[in-house]
Amino acid sequence: IDAVKQIRYTTSHPRDMDDDLIRAHGDIKKLMPFLHLPVQSGPDKILKAMNRKHTADRYRDIVADLRKVRPDLVFSSDFIVGFPGETDQDHEDTMQLIRDVVFASAYSFKYSARPGTPAANMTNLVREDVKSARLTELQELIAAQYLDFNKSCVGTTTQVLFERKGRRDGQLQGRTPFYQAINVQANERLIGEIVDVIVTEATANALVGEVKTSESILKSA
């Protein structure tokens, strides 16, 4: 459909990431270079207990294959810390997986029992204070990776789909192809439009930019 300029899909389970879908990330240029690919944990024994049906190395291989066909692809994921039976080494395995892959963002949570699931009947529970410490450590690593990625975008020009008014007067908020939130001083008539924007600032949570004009081009030259 020619009128569709950008395509995203919400998420994919690693076990469903077959060769055809991997190739699509290289072949379909309208498919945005951001993929939410949940892994949940790093050690294989925890992945097995979660019934994830993939290993940590299989996850790494999928990421490597995707980056071969789309080198600019960035990843988001989900993590659960403190799953029953998780040891200090298991947690370190998760941290190493994060270091190996490098994520642009992630959703992370402490394990809590869900009635009706096999894990709800497990007895080798992790102490609450240990879960909290592990979650803090994991979130700090993800935040550092996200900030590094955002900083690497400063000075670049990116296409932004403006979605809504920002919090400040005259400000719009949009999304980059990498799904980063970006705030730009711009006319609200641009909401719903895809516009070239120069990234001028970066924080851990969002970017700041300015609409690319002939004047801004001269300024950055």
For each predicted feature, which ranges?
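Short, hinge-like loop/turn segments at secondary-structure boundaries
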Residues: 25-26, 94, 123-126
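Flexible glycine/acidic-rich beta-alpha junction loops that bind and position SAM and/or redox cofactors
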Residues: 16-20, 39-50, 81-88, 104-129, ...
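Conserved, mostly hydrophobic/aromatic
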Residues: 9, 37, 78, 98, ...
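Conserved SAM/AdoMet-binding glycine-rich loop
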Residues: 1-88, 99
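Short beta-alpha junctions and helix-cap segments that line functional grooves
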Residues: 21-22, 94, 184-185
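Terminal RNA-binding accessory module
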Residues: 120-221
